[in-house]
Amino acid sequence: KTFYRGTIFTFNHTATLANLQGVIPDSLFADEDQFTFLRDGVIGIEDGIITTVGDYSVIKEQIKAEDNFVDYSNKLITPGFIDAHMHATQTSAVSAYGEKLLTWLNNYVFPSEVAFKSDISARREYGILLNQLFKNGTTSICAYLPSSYDGADVLFEITHKYNMRVIMGNTIM
């Protein structure tokens, strides 16, 4: 079992349409039933499943010597972020100059996507992408691939290795 200590912030309800319809925009942080905030909290994880969430002063008695304990005191622990729209093969073209969309696509995006025909290049580019996503707290993605599907198997393999939640499909441009 692994315990993570830190400041914990999470929402208490699954984001279903029914739950979201009941939230009044200005009331989200006024209604403490909507979220959990623990200044000195602990999350316990066993076999990849969160089994414990609570105040450290209460939970510390449950932590055994053989358990892993990670102290993130003064750090914020939140659920992973979700990137709901990303083009997985365009990492190297992000912020590339382009006067108009077609100019940008033709001069930067389409040429950079050619690299994904090589599994070696795809691994390198996807490695850069995933490092940036994880570094910024993103753990789930909805990714668009080029119409050729080049590198798709590589991205599935890498994201599976990290147990990342992924929805992928190709883009016809």
Residue map of PLM features:
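Flexible loop residues that form catalytic
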Residues: 7, 11, 87, 146
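Active-site-proximal loop/turn and secondary-structure-junction residues that shape catalytic pockets
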Residues: 147, 172-173
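N-terminal metal-binding scaffold of metallo-dependent hydrolase/deaminase domains
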Residues: 1-63
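Structural motif
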Residues: 1, 68, 139-140, 165-167
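Hydrophobic faces of well-ordered beta-strands that scaffold small-molecule active sites
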Residues: 80-84, 141-143, 166-170
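Gly/Ser/Thr-rich helix-start
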Residues: 55, 81, 138
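Alpha-helical scaffold segments that flank or form the walls of functional sites
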Residues: 95-164
